[in-house]
Amino acid sequence: MDIVAHIQGDPGSSLTPLILIHAISGLALPYFALRPLSTDSDDGDSDKSRPVYGLSSPIFESVSAFRRHGKSLPSLALEYVRIIRREIQPRGPYLLGGWSMGGMLAIEMAAIFVAQGETVKHVVMIDSLNPEVYPPFQDSQEHQVLSTIMYNAIAWRVEGLEEACMPTLSDDASTTTSSDNSRASTDHGADSEVESEADLDDFMQQLREHVHQGMRMLASYHTLHRHIYLPDTAVTLIKCTMLGNLSPLLRASRKVFAKKNLLDPHNGWRTEQFRSFRSVPFASTHDACFDAEASEELTTILRGVLKDID
């Protein structure tokens, strides 16, 4: 899987590319669910079709590279700044965004770009929490439980997200073995089937590790005593207004935090951190942002945010 994916738009357009960072799954694939984000892209003028790129985690190319750079949100963000300069856009101004942890990483990356003398026009966060307020784990068991809950929530969606890139994935991929995922209806031979199943097992293991390490990065962020200030960057938070089902395995304090955050239109961010900060309500649960029933509204909101940005 390539780290950088061209999602939509004309790479030759004069409009600033929108670079979307993966969520805790490490996958940029959900962004392919978005409709065209350029409102004038259908009039035949390719220059008005903003290029949109998605950034996936390096874990799917090199586990060792992820382990080297994925020790904290700032260290991972620094590696992503290097990747963007090398493979997408060597110089600013930049336009960044991301869903959930992707928005947190986008803010970290914006701070790094600015420290390097670049301009970051805007950061668009899709229901991203300020990691400063994320509660630390009480113990290793809570880390494991939360990581498993998160992994399972992602794994059952993987079939729809990965169908263009991966062999068939079972809906219950988090619990089946490779033998359970046999593709009896394919035209490939047995060797190909075994190889595909091995690739799938590796992929799901990488996904599990990424979620586990991502949760650790969030829960330990407070220990960095990091407070980002971007006085020249505008920020939009697309805020989910619906609370999904809370797992009975969650501790009571986690459930209280989730309910409290739902009522906070800023998701813990402080408006004085940025040149401007706008919160736009989005009628979706956090996990369903890119599901079919929500992606059209999300596209409309993103179009509105982007329409006045060159």
From Swiss-Prot:
Coiled coil: none annotated. Residues 170-184 have a biased composition (Low complexity). Its main location: membrane. Keywords: Hydrolase, Membrane, Transmembrane, Transmembrane helix. It is an enzyme of class 3 (hydrolase). Pathway: Secondary metabolite biosynthesis. It is a multi-pass membrane protein. Its EC number is 3.1.-.-. One of its GO terms (molecular function) is hydrolase activity. Residues 168-195 are annotated as: Disordered. GO terms for cellular component: membrane. The chain crosses the membrane at residues 14-34, 95-115. It is found in: Membrane. One of its GO terms (biological process) is biosynthetic process. Induction: Expression is positively regulated by the cluster-specific transcription factor pytR. Disruption phenotype: Impairs the production of pyranterreones. Thioesterase; part of the gene cluster that mediates the biosynthesis of pyranterreones, a family of antioxidative compounds. The first step of pyranonigrins biosynthesis is performed by the hybrid PKS-NRPS synthetase pytA that condenses 4 malonyl-CoA units ato the acetyl starter unit by the modular PKS of pytA. The acyl chain is then connected to an L-serine through the amide bond by the modular NRPS of pytA. A tetramic acid is formed and released from the PKS-NRPS pytA to give pyranterreone 5 with the help of the thioesterase pytI. Belongs to the AMT4 thioesterase family. This is Thioesterase pytI. It comes from Aspergillus terreus. The lineage of its organism: Eukaryota, Fungi, Dikarya, Ascomycota, Pezizomycotina.
